[in-house]
Amino acid sequence: MPVTILHNPRCSKSRQSLELLNKHGVDSKVILYLKNPPTPSEIKSILKKLNLGPSEILRTGESCFKEFAISLEEISDDELIALMTENPILIERPIIFDDQKAVIGRPPENTLDML
């Protein structure tokens, strides 16, 4: 079954996860999500497959997040998803998913759960 990977080629974990997929002959669609960010509905679908909330895939250490000075207790899930769509650098990476499930490739070995 083909999988999709939200990939950032500048991220070592993302590169390692993609390499694992290729090594195991997995047909994968690579989305350079910084250039082609997922829509709010796509993020919601991925979150459902991950069984996580938006704050759990949020990269709070990114400088742009700190500049927003947002309190996670005071922002709604929809607002957080919109923020990630507008600023995709805030989305944890890599995320590998298919029609049924998803994993975050941190550590890259998590990617093997998609095989």
Roles of regions detected by a PLM:
Residues 35-115:
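Thiol/selenol-based redox catalytic cores and closely related redox-interacting motifs
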